[in-house]
């Protein structure tokens, strides 16, 4: 099997902590000045006052009690509940009765909260449908209509209809939506594309950025910045003209670059890192450093095993969620242990490629509007970012892009994130050719490309394959003239999804693809989800290009 070639990854790329009890290594101890110079962010941007409160903010010890007692099997359930009355009244009632001998926490929750609705539980797939028919019939099932904001609910109302991924995810997600949109366009659902375009523009206008998802507990972070790719899709499909989104793109860019001008070399603030040579690169970040509402108990348990201050671990867990790769060996000091997570000290190759695309899009649209100074400024920014990426994140010896540990000043692991520079046109042809060789020998399997070559038990690692990574690899390699590799990945992935669909009559979030026998992907913090938005989107687009498998 092809995957047998990657059993022994390059030892230079491993970052395994030798002494697992000693978390503050000498590389970090020498950085006191840098850390002290990194100011704490102010209050999160977005909704002011009470509407920005998360369930953990509102319910305080009641929230912690419910989550620690595991009233619900999924930690996300309680944050998604809606209160039946003013949260303050609920909290007062709880404090009055919680010490009674006959107090029943579950009954208290059921009496004071509406549980989240499971929309897709009644949908039954028709086994006679082809894969294409199945996907087209799922769009209405995954569509949520706009509704008035439920008072004190964590759900943020949106002005237009939107698509959710499915399963436990009953809200829209930022980077998921781009890959879902690819399929909507192929299915001729321009109506939904327009709605989602309006929604994301509205979020930028109202929150200053696109949150991870439309929940209050997602406001403190974003996700991989793919709005520029969405705008490109809107333009290509004649849904919305790109010019109307120039201001939105600039606002998103300002969010990601906040604080950059005040940094000196080896300093970081929020999403921005000033490198030793003065260049600017970006990292993932979350403005909060508390356990995530939707994974509260899991985060508390992870922090207990870290040997570090809990708030640092919580920040890195949150930043990992902002990356979309939650979680992966990419963010771990010890590749087998989530408690060693250090997301904020890595400069991710995919994030900086997406920001290169954002800078290029602003330059291109500014040129269309005759704004020559803005065009020149952002072309220079894109060029500077590409130079910095080549300096710090390109491994010339192995011919691959890798994440960069900016605190240890060394390259990190190789993963499928390395294909994003090709997808956005940031690589040169020599880099693309060399990267293709590495992907063939290290990530390609009969089922598609692996997220990484490391087996850690995390979901964004071997043996799993994910739809967005397949799409970016397929299109990225074809863009640089490697049709053979792009087509092979496409056919392998379509075969994986179709074979599983014929057996199970559903599409899922991720697939086990390491051994050529398609089955459910594992790992992560929650059970495998079906639906599934971005898998549907990518597969529907590929069917349009390659036909049904």
Swiss-Prot record:
Keywords: Cytoplasm, Glycosidase, Hydrolase. InterPro entries: 6-hairpin_glycosidase_sf (IPR008928), 6hp_glycosidase-like_sf (IPR012341), Cyt_trehalase (IPR023715), Glyco_hydro_37 (IPR001661), Glyco_hydro_37_CS (IPR018232). One of its GO terms (molecular function) is alpha,alpha-trehalase activity. Substrate binds at residues 168, 175-176, 212, 221-223, 292-294, 324, 525. The active site is at 326 (proton donor/acceptor), 509 (proton donor/acceptor). SUPFAM superfamilies: Six-hairpin glycosidases. GO terms for biological process: cellular hyperosmotic response; trehalose catabolic process. It is found in: Cytoplasm. Pathway: Glycan degradation; trehalose degradation; D-glucose from alpha,alpha-trehalose: step 1/1. Its EC number is 3.2.1.28. It catalyses: alpha,alpha-trehalose + H2O = alpha-D-glucose + beta-D-glucose. Its main location: cytoplasm. One of its GO terms (cellular component) is cytoplasm. Hydrolyzes trehalose to glucose. Could be involved, in cells returning to low osmolarity conditions, in the utilization of the accumulated cytoplasmic trehalose, which was synthesized in response to high osmolarity. Monomer. Belongs to the glycosyl hydrolase 37 family. This is Cytoplasmic trehalase. It comes from Escherichia coli O81 (strain ED1a). The lineage of its organism: Bacteria, Pseudomonadati, Pseudomonadota, Gammaproteobacteria, Enterobacterales. The gene is treF.
């Amino acid at each position: 099997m092809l995957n047998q070639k990657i059993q022994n990854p390059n030892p230079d790329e491993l970052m395994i902590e030798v002494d697992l009890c000693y978390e503050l290594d000498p590389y970090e101890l020498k950085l006191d000045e840098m850390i002290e110079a990194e100011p704490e962010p102010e209050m999160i941007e977005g909704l002011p006052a009470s509407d920005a409160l998360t369930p953990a903010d509102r319910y305080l010890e009641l929230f912690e009690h419910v989550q620690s007692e595991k009233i619900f099997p999924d930690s996300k359930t309680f944050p998604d509940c809606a209160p039946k009355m003013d949260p303050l009244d609920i909290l007062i009632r709880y404090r009055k009765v919680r010490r009674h001998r006959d107090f029943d926490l579950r009954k208290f929750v059921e009496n004071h909260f509406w549980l989240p609705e499971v929309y897709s539980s009644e949908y039954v797939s028709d086994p006679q449908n082809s894969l294409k028919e199945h996907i087209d019939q799922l769009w209405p099932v995954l569509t949520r209509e706009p509704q008035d904001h439920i008072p004190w609910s964590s759900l943020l109302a949106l002005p237009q209809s939107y698509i959710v991924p499915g399963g436990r995810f009953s809200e829209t997600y930022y980077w998921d939506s781009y890959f879902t949109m690819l399929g909507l366009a192929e299915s001729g659902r321009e109506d939904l594309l327009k709605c989602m375009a309006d929604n994301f523009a509205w979020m930028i206008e109202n929150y200053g950025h696109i949150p991870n998802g439309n929940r209050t507990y997602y406001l403190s972070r974003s996700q991989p910045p793919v709005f520029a790719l969405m705008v490109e899709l809107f333009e290509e499909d004649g849904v919305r003209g790109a010019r109307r989104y120039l201001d939105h793109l600039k606002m998103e860019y300002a969010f990601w670059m906040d604080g950059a001008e005040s940094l000196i070399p080896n300093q970081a603030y929020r999403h921005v890192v000033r490198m030793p040579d003065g260049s600017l690169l970006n990292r993932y970040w979350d403005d909060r450093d508390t356990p995530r509402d939707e994974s509260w108990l899991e985060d508390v348990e992870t922090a207990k095993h870290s040997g570090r201050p809990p708030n640092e671990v919580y920040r890195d867990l949150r930043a990992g969620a902002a990356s979309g790769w939650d979680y992966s060996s990419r963010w771990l000091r010890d590749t087998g242990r989530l408690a060693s997570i250090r997301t904020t000290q890595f400069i991710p190759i995919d994030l900086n490629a997406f920001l290169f695309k954002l800078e290029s899009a602003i330059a291109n649209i500014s040129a269309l509007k005759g704004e020559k100074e803005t065009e020149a400024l952002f072309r220079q920014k894109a060029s500077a970012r590409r130079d910095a990426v080549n300096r710090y994140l390109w491994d010339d010896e192995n011919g691959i892009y890798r994440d960069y540990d900016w605190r240890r000043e060394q390259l990190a692991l190789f993963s499928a994130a390395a294909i994003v520079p090709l997808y956005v046109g940031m690589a040169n042809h020599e880099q693309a050719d060399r990267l293709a060789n590495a992907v063939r020998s290290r990530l390609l399997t009969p089922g598609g490309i692996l997220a990484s070559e490391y087996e850690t038990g995390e979901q964004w690692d071997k043996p799993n394959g994910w739809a967005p990574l397949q799409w970016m690899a397929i299109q990225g390699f074809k863009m640089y003239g490697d049709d053979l590799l792009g087509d092979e990945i496409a056919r392998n992935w379509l075969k994986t999804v179709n074979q599983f669909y014929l057996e199970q009559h559903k599409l899922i979030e991720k697939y086990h693809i390491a051994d050529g026998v398609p089955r459910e992907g594992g790992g992560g913090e929650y059970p495998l989800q079906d639906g599934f938005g971005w898998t549907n989107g990518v597969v529907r687009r590929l069917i349009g290009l390659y036909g049904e498998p």
